[in-house]
Amino acid sequence: MSAAPAYSEDKGGSAGPGEPEYGHDPASGGIFSSDYKRHDDLKEMLDTNKDSLKLEAMKRIVAMIARGKNASDLFPAVVKNVACKNIEVKKLVYVYLVRYAEEQQDLALLSISTFQRGLKDPNQLIRASALRVLSSIRVPIIVPIMMLAIKEAASDMSPYVRKTAAHAIPKLYSLDSDQKDQLIEVIEKLLADKTTLVAGSVVMAFEEVCPERIDLIHKNYRKLCNLLIDVEEWGQVVIISMLTRYARTQFLSPTQNESLLEENAEKAFYGSEEDEAKGAGSEETAAAAAPSRKPYVMDPDHRLLLRNTKPLLQSRSAAVVMAVAQLYFHLAPKAEVGVIAKALVRLLRSHSEVQYVVLQNVATMSIKRRGMFEPYLKSFYIRSTDPTQIKILKLEVLTNLANETNIPTVLREFQTYIRSMDKDFVAATIQAIGRCATNIGRVRDTCLNGLVQLLSNRDELVVAESVVVIKKLLQMQPAQHGEIIKHLAKLTDNIQVPMARASILWLIGEYCEHVPRIAPDVLRKMAKSFTAEEDIVKLQVINLAAKLYLTNSKQTKLLTQYVLSLAKYDQNYDIRDRARFTRQLIVPSEQGGALSRHAKKLFLAPKPAPVLESSFKDRDHFQLGSLSHLLNAKATGYQELPDWPEEAPDPSVRNVEVPEWTKCSNREKRKEKEKPFYSDSEGESGPTESADSDPESESESDSKSSSESGSGESSSESDNEDQDEDEEKGRGSESEQSEEDGKRKTKKKVPERKGEASSSDEGSDSSSSSSESEMTSESEEEQLEPASWSRKTPPSSKSAPATKEISLLDLEDFTPPSVQPVSPPAIVSTSLAADLEGLTLTDSTLVPSLLSPVSGVGRQELLHRVAGEGLAVDYTFSRQPFSGDPHMVSVHIHFSNSSDTPIKGLHVGTPKLPAGISIQEFPEIESLAPGESATAVMGINFCDSTQAANFQLCTQTRQFYVSIQPPVGELMAPVFMSENEFKKEQGKLMGMNEITEKLMLPDTCRSDHIVVQKVTATANLGRVPCGTSDEYRFAGRTLTGGSLVLLTLDARPAGAAQLTVNSEKMVIGTMLVKDVIQALTQ
């Protein structure tokens, strides 16, 4: 083979006779040269049938990428091997594709079906890599495929794949922000995941997509706090940052009553005699004010957060320590914030980059919490090896920590720093001395004298900076320092730094009455060199001339006119403008303007002394540790730190409902005894529980790998509550283990609720607070009624296994509505027709029932009676044509009022619908009396997609946000055709329009009756006559687009079968195959 010689040549060898030998790196193999023949050899190696050659080629290609070489021209040859059976080759192919898929989008799109198959690979690394490649293809046309892949991966048994799904969410959101509602549902589902591997990634996705949806965190707050210690380091940083913002909105400020407590303590210690002398009136006033000042009691969840983050101060990661430090600074009481000082000081031994960030934050903290870092003053002393930016930041911290006790030590340090060779550092030190003199009055004279001594320094920059600082200090006590002003005036001949010269001129002009003889002479010298001065100096010369003209016009009138004449023709616009303005103001014209009379007040008005403040003073409004705080400017994507609430929000929103869990488990155990058919199939637990299931449930987990959910329905709140409570209580006792078994069997039977029906009330805080007590007060008889209803509805329960895939994600509430439902007659009759369909002996007898709708799913909850404050709402897909529009899915909405008051004005509010989806609202229900039920019909055009229809269910007083998401089988209508027509249409839909999967039918699903029932319950398809007894054909069309959907099931002996779906809509075909296989294999 032609590739073999090149392959051995790459390994290196000796040169031929008479040729010089060249040494080369055997690792490179000559691959990294610009010789295109090398790449041709790699392409040949990738085209061979030998996995060993392919593996070697991929290793070299990945090595090229690692060394920064361009390997994009190999994309066609590499992408062909994505379907290679060798797992090691496939891994490296995906590594390559993740790197180049975004650059070679057109070629990547050609292999998109292969990537989709990779999502179902048994190896979790391949599934995750396939999802990473899909999310790297930044083409809007594949958004539906990406959404489907993310939903499937979110239900994957592997935590690593679910983590990758969380990473893909922000990528899809940045590509198409219209998918936000569906992505929020996936985020809500992943937030309920108990796996530490997923927690950080999903919180990052939450922060990117919907940081305002703080209600998604309520039920998962305690779980996140408890998992925090075990999450990977970057995940800890993200979670802590998010929980900081969450806590600022849900808890009261721990420092709100500190001033009041200090006043009371001082009063109790000193003012006992004064209190006795006070009149009764003052006592009454104090008594009236007392109820409004309640003592602060920390919320237990607030304490939980502080307690669980404190150990992370010992983390090896500087980012984690910094995150905990900012959390304590923003959330902890003053008495507890001090624990972060030692951890931050420890970080100062790290790299200079880490020191820079830490010192930025310490500088901000030390302004408000000076006492926190005072014991560690020596840790901020400057080393000669420190970079300049580190020195300046340490200087900032030392200045902030200076007080009357430690100022002698600090000033001695500053004296040493002034001798440094780093001029920027010396200038910052002089500024720091000026700030110390401003803040501590008793050392002001000492600092001023030291700065005056620096005026004789040989370094002009040191002298210039000293002049600027002296100018600011002299403004505080100008009358006492006339000699210093004279000394500065003498320096005008020597100092050439513009800022220093400008400062001296300003001082002389401002306090010219203290140096009446020197000031005119300085003006004379400056007039000589006016044209050669910098602009900032020229402006101060004009100011000096104006002030001297107003105070000593006899000596300076001509000089002032000369300076103004020079300035009038200066090149700088500002100087010319200032000269004209000043001339009109100080030199009276013939008319005598009104401003001229007040010129002295304008120029010689007393000015307040400048306040020397830290540049970090106003940075504390940014969240510490953020990029915005580092830059002192709001960065893109920065989330503002919320203000503390004035009143404590309802803490019960973070509670979990235990009673509902217990009752549900017991009821499902009773149902299991009555229905052994369902106990044969292995129970499925939610995707979040599979990661940490018991060893005893391994077989159960294995069965789940063939039926991973991809419907994208979000986990409900009650499931989140159950998981969190289960985590807190543990699983030690036998009773708890039995509850765990009940939970799995419960989730096995939930499939009756196939489509998604999530509801969130605007007043979720208040409704959830009463949910626990309401559920606890319900009697056992009330709980048995829904169970009996479930048993009395054969069509729903029989079709349940066919919908189990969707129900994995829809565990919002295990308790069906308490009101006895009345099924529409049409549903019952069609279900009976479906039952009879499997009993026919000839194909001709199938024709009358082919087009009759079959009830696929039972009632599904739209609004729980607790969240709806007594209003319970369910819905069913009736599979009957909607009278208003044949393209719409007919949905029956069932209302029930379990409250004590009538509910008035039931109607649909403003819908929030994705593009293409429309709703035909049901007529308004004027009133629903207590205990009564009502049914309405509405139509929804899902536009041949499984995107949820989100809308508001409104009454006269409340609005409830609800969502209906259809299973893929409800998006089509049955079609009648002959066998020949079926084969003809199937021949047109081959290639990429055909999806084939093999499966093994269980013993309970090998009769014609069961097979037909399960398929028609899963999808609204019509049966097509077939000449053979071991083959089943079904046909239908999508409601909106009218696209043909053909399904063929070829059953073989011993239970082996092959399922084929032909449809031009690949996404619908893929989802339908998955649903039907799951229904048939249960």
From Swiss-Prot:
One GO BP: anterograde axonal transport
Residues making up the signal peptide according to the UniProt record: none
Tissue: Isoform 1 expression is specific to nervous system. Expressed in nerve terminal and cell body, and is associated with nerve-terminal vesicles. Expression seen in Purkinje cells, cortical neurons, neuroectodermal tumors and graded in cerebral cortex (deeper layers exhibit stronger expression). Isoform 2 is expressed at high levels in brain and testis.
Compositional bias ranges of the Acidic residues kind: 691-700, 716-727, 775-784
One family name in Pfam for this protein: Adaptin_N
Biased composition (Polar residues): 790-800
UniProt feature, compositional bias: Low complexity: 279-295, 704-715, 757-774
Location of the protein in the cell: Cytoplasmic vesicle, Clathrin-coated vesicle membrane; Golgi apparatus
Stretch list, region Disordered: 1-30, 272-295, 666-802
SMART domains: AP3B1_C
Bias kind Basic and acidic residues: ranges: 666-677
Keyword Transit peptide: no
Keyword line: Cytoplasmic vesicle, Epilepsy, Golgi apparatus, Membrane, Phosphoprotein, Protein transport, Transport
Domain of life: Eukaryota
One Gene Ontology cellular component: intracellular vesicle
Membrane topology: Peripheral membrane protein
Modified residues (Phosphoserine): 272, 282
Family to which the UniProt record says this protein belongs: Belongs to the adaptor complexes large subunit family.
Functional description taken from the UniProt entry: Subunit of non-clathrin- and clathrin-associated adaptor protein complex 3 (AP-3) that plays a role in protein sorting in the late-Golgi/trans-Golgi network (TGN) and/or endosomes. The AP complexes mediate both the recruitment of clathrin to membranes and the recognition of sorting signals within the cytosolic tails of transmembrane cargo molecules. AP-3 appears to be involved in the sorting of a subset of transmembrane proteins targeted to lysosomes and lysosome-related organelles.
Oligomer status and interactors: AP-3 associates with the BLOC-1 complex. Adaptor protein complex 3 (AP-3) is a heterotetramer composed of two large adaptins (delta-type subunit AP3D1 and beta-type subunit AP3B1 or AP3B2), a medium adaptin (mu-type subunit AP3M1 or AP3M2) and a small adaptin (sigma-type subunit APS1 or AP3S2).
PANTHER family referenced in this protein's UniProt entry, alphabetically: ADAPTOR COMPLEX SUBUNIT BETA FAMILY MEMBER (PTHR11134)
Disease annotated for this entry: Developmental and epileptic encephalopathy 48: A form of epileptic encephalopathy, a heterogeneous group of severe early-onset epilepsies characterized by refractory seizures, neurodevelopmental impairment, and poor prognosis. Development is normal prior to seizure onset, after which cognitive and motor delays become apparent. DEE48 is an autosomal recessive form characterized by onset of seizures in the first year of life. Affected individuals manifest global developmental delay, intellectual disability, absent speech, and poor, if any, motor development.
Protein name per UniProt: AP-3 complex subunit beta-2
Organism: Homo sapiens (Human)
UniProt gene name: AP3B2
